[in-house]
Amino acid sequence: MKKNSLTLTVVANMTSNYSESLGNIASVQKVFKNRKIYSMRSRESLKNAIMVQSGMYDDLETSLDGAAQKKVSEELNASNCRALEGGYMNTQGTTYVRKSSFYLTDAVAAEHFVNETRFHNNLYLATNYAKEQGISVQSNGGSAGLMPYQYEYDKSLKIYSMTIDLEMIGKDENFHEEADAKEKAERVIALLDAVENLSLVVRG
């Protein structure tokens, strides 16, 4: 029986991405549903982590055309470069675009968000600097570089799905090139292994 795609749904205990900061306060990314707030880890963060942990980015080559982008050419394409499996847009000369062969949803918490704010500062560093300058960190905190900050912390069970397009793996239609069956299978296995052992801590 021919299978065109593979989908798996994952439940894992993980931290969240951070979104916009207000002053020295960093807040986690959230989604609103049924009048409740749920923390999340973005699909972009998950995808990057999977590409790194699977080893897909080990052969990544980049170029600069206004912004850094993945290097693509007739000699270097998704059929022979695993780093391009997650999709690319290259604008050097002729513009080439290839969609990713695997897709992720955001990882959304199973339970609604309960804020846990953590407070920190760089007191030790500021005290060291104040001592060198002969000033008091208590009375001249600003001059000593004392900086208190706080951030929301969240680690909870989150749910996400990944779908792999088995017909697209290892294929680059921009250059009419395609990897062999063994290479395609190795890429799929690498993605699944990465999900199983994925680092579930993210900051920033």
What is each PLM-predicted segment?
Residues 1-204:
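RNA-binding basic/glycine-rich loop and surface signature characteristic of RAMP-family CRISPR effectors
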